[in-house]
Swiss-Prot record:
Produces ATP from ADP in the presence of a proton gradient across the membrane. The gamma chain is believed to be important in regulating ATPase activity and the flow of protons through the CF(0) complex. SUPFAM superfamilies: ATP synthase (F1-ATPase), gamma subunit. The gene is atpG. F-type ATPases have 2 components, CF(1) - the catalytic core - and CF(0) - the membrane proton channel. CF(1) has five subunits: alpha(3), beta(3), gamma(1), delta(1), epsilon(1). CF(0) has three main subunits: a, b and c. Belongs to the ATPase gamma chain family. The lineage of its organism: Bacteria, Bacillati, Bacillota, Bacilli, Bacillales. This is ATP synthase gamma chain. GO terms for molecular function: ATP binding; proton-transporting ATP synthase activity, rotational mechanism. Keywords: ATP synthesis, Cell membrane, CF(1), Hydrogen ion transport, Ion transport, Membrane, Transport. GO terms for cellular component: plasma membrane; proton-transporting ATP synthase complex. It is a peripheral membrane protein. InterPro entries: ATP_synth_F1_ATPase_gsu, ATP_synth_F1_gsu, ATP_synth_F1_gsu_CS. Gene3D superfamilies: 3.40.1380.10, ATP synthase, gamma subunit, helix hairpin domain.
């Protein structure tokens, strides 16, 4: 016969788990709202700096700046943005799977590429598989500031300028909605596909467009990294909220099934006791 105490223990254990996942769902929901606001608030800045950079670059075609110039590719860098923690559904696995597939398709040797990792899960994945992780940052807050990733962003740009690698791709999860995100690949460097300014505004540059590009181009590339991080953080919180909601729903279903099983077992035990009592009474007559 089914052990009633064991079933009761499983019910209580599942209820405790449900309380935890429900709390995590609510926390992630709160973090998502703020992360989504941060990502949206950053868009106007990105659009404006892109306009300015595009305007300067279109007027200085022969600047020869290394960030604007394509060169023969001997080594490629992949900047991969993930999270420090799990329990976020396919948030990390989907992006890691895509990056790994890309590496397998594009490269025959590990000497042809390097990894820059944002997030402990990303770093540990590539280190465990013996990929060359040349820079990483972990322990980011839920609402990161530019200062949190300034070092790795500047390293990424600086190593391209210095010739450590010849092109840089960035991978992150683009936030679509609270229930959807998509793995996005963006070629970060060289900046060979800068669009002309979207507005008809004209700019006058002092001391010169080339001098301003020298300062603005690294800042622009670094801001793209930060914008992708904000986008990725919104996706992370959304994925974790969805995962915890699914876990909570599954716990509720399991509690219902176990409760039904418990009641049936209890009813069977009572029926058996009555049968034994009746049988014993009949034997005494």
């Amino acid at each position: 016969m089914v052990n009633l105490r064991e079933i009761k223990g499983r019910i209580n254990s599942t209820k405790s788990t449900k309380q935890i996942t429900k709390a995590m769902q609510m926390v992630s929901s709160s973090k998502l709202r703020r992360a989504e606001q941060n990502a949206k608030a950053y868009v106007p800045y990105m659009e404006k700096i892109q306009d300015v950079v595009g305007a300067i670059a279109s007027g200085t075609k022969d600047s020869g700046h290394p960030m604007l110039t394509a060169r023969p590719v001997k080594k490629t860098a992949y900047l991969v943005i993930g999270s420090d923690r799990g329990l976020a559904g396919a948030y990390n696995s989907s992006i890691l799977r895509q990056v790994q597939r890309t590496i397998d398709e594009r490269h025959k040797s590990k000497d042809e590429y390097v990894i820059l990792a944002i997030g402990r899960v990303v770093r540990d994945y590539f280190v465990k598989r013996d990929h060359n992780v040349i820079s990483d940052v972990v322990g980011l807050p839920d609402q990161p500031t530019f200062a949190d990733i300034k070092e790795i962003a500047r390293n990424a740009v600086g190593m391209f300028i210095d010739g450590t690698y010849d092109q840089l791709y960035m991978y992150y999860n683009h936030f679509v909605s609270a229930i959807a995100n998509e793995v996005t690949e963006k070629k970060l460097l060289p900046l060979t596909d800068l669009a002309p300014p979207s507005s008809n505004a004209s700019y006058e540059f002092e001391p010169s467009g080339e001098a301003i590009l020298e300062v603005l181009l690294p800042q622009y590339a670094e801001s793209l990294v930060y914008g992708a991080l904000l986008d990725g953080k919104a996706s992370e919180h959304a994925s974790r909220m969805t995962a915890m909601k699914n876990a909570t729903d599954n716990a509720s279903d399991l509690i219902s099934d176990l409760s039904l099983q418990y009641n049936r077992a209890r009813q069977a035990a009572i029926t058996q006791e009555i049968t034994e009592i009746v049988g014993g009474a009949a034997a005494l007559e």
